[in-house]
Structures are given as C-alpha cells and as structure tokens.
Amino acid sequence: MGTSIGKLLEQVDGTLYKEYILERYKAGENGNSNFKDPTFNVPSPRFGKLDKPKQFEHAEFCSDLPSGHFCLDYLKNRKIPKEFYSQLLFTSHYKKFIDTLVPNHGKKLVDDARVIIPFYDVYNNLIAVSGRALETNDKTVRYITIRTTDSEDKLVFGMDRLNVHETVKVVEGPIDSLFLSNCVASGDANLTAVADNISAGKKVIIFDNEPRNKDIVKLMQESIKSNHQIVIWPDTIQAKDINEMIISGISPDEIESIISSNTVSGLEAQLKFNFWKKV
C-alpha cells in the first residue's frame, strides 16, 4: 500500500514534516488540493575516502618516468623518499597542464617544466596543485599554486594522510612534510592558522630555522603567546628547513628525535625563543 511524502515525513521526522507543511502553505497548497509531490535532491552520505585521480592530462606520475629523467635527478638530489614518487607529477608544460585542469584560473603562466605537488582534502578530493620549477633563473617563480575548487579555505598539504589520533606536526613546505610522520604543510609561514583549524589532541608547530627572519620570529612569538607547542631549534642545527637537514646528512629519525626533544610551550618556550632569535 502506497503512502504520500507528507505521511512518510510525519512518521520519520516530525520537524521536517512541519517545515514541509509550511512550505506547502506558502505555495498556496492545502490538503484538499491536487499537487505533485516535490523532489528532494539529497546528496548521498559519504562513507570513507574517494579514489585519487590515476592520471592527469599533460602530466605523468614521477614513478612512471624513465630512469635518468632529469625530474628524477631533481627528486634524488632533494632526497625525497621514493614512496612519494607515485604521488608527485611531472609536466614539461605547466601552463598547458593548468589550462586543461582549471580552464578559468586567470593567472599568467609560463609553459615550463615543473614537479607538480597535488593537494587533497581529507576525502581525497583534489583541491589545488603546486608546481615547482625545475629550471630556474632570477625571473622564475619557483612555486606556482593554483586552486582547483572555488573554496577560500586555507590550503593545507597532507590532509589526505593525516591521523588526528596521533601527534600532528605542522611545517611550512610541502616537500619538508614528506620526511616527517603525520605531518602537514601550510605552504606559507602562518603555521598557527593551520594548527588552529585541525582537530587533534596534540599538535606541534615546526617553523623554519630562521632566527634572523623578522616575519618568522613574529609568528613564532604569536604561537607561544597562544600557548601552542612549538619547536625551538638547537644551536647545533644550522640548516634552514627540514629538507636542508636531510640533504646535509641528518636522517628523518634523527630529525624526529630532535623535534621531540625541543618541543616546548609556555614559559619554557619563551625563554628558549629569546635565546634562539637573532632580531
């Protein structure tokens, strides 16, 4: 025996049923009139993650590049873990790649060769791509990041790999984040904004090791005042960022240990910060 949409809503959700009756009343409908049941376009609930794109036009995954390719040489020189080659892309025509992926991006681009770093959200939706130039000069823009959606939310790299039940590390550079466990990257120096928007039990903010950079120093001071846990790099570390430390010969495990031993907050953070900064 069939039933009307109104009867069904009354049985399932009384609040929704009242809203439905009100909408009918506003439309001049009543119980004695003939009307067509409305169509509800309710999005399907999302269970788990989507599959990431398996191919892109005008680009190929670095894991598919032939041995000796100059892009692979770049990755090897940066000591990027091979496990991430299948997640990074190479294009010899960045403009063509972007024009196809995001036709109305509105940016003036050069059709040069770049390593492409895809940004995904927690559901594996592609939200942005960042192209790192492989051949640079004084006029080259090293990183060009393009959003693939209309969202104005802060871009964060690594959200697809994040486990909020473990300590979350926040760094600046996407490449830096590839060397640390459970790490995301802000793409800029405003790490605190990223940390504030991640719901995790414990978060550690890891600024670049630039004690003479006024902007970094200012942002670190703000993080300390907000009572965040941050890393104050020891004097024994001369490298500017995580990737430089790796290239200098420090292993990822050693860096993790250094981070753990130098994560501070509150008064201890302020005291160590005062000795660390050089401006």
Located regions from the model:
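Short metal-binding segments enriched for Cys and/or His
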Residues: 1-13
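Generic detection of long, well-ordered alpha-helical segments
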Residues: 2, 61-68, 190, 210, ...
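N-terminal compositionally biased, intrinsically disordered segments and leader/signal-like regions
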Residues: 4, 40, 146-150
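TOPRIM metal-binding catalytic domain and adjacent DNA-binding surface shared by DnaG-type primases
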Residues: 11-115, 123, 225, 260-279
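Phosphate-handling DNA/RNA-contact segment within nucleic-acid enzymes
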Residues: 94-202, 216-217
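TOPRIM fold recognition
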Residues: 127, 139, 165-168, 174-279
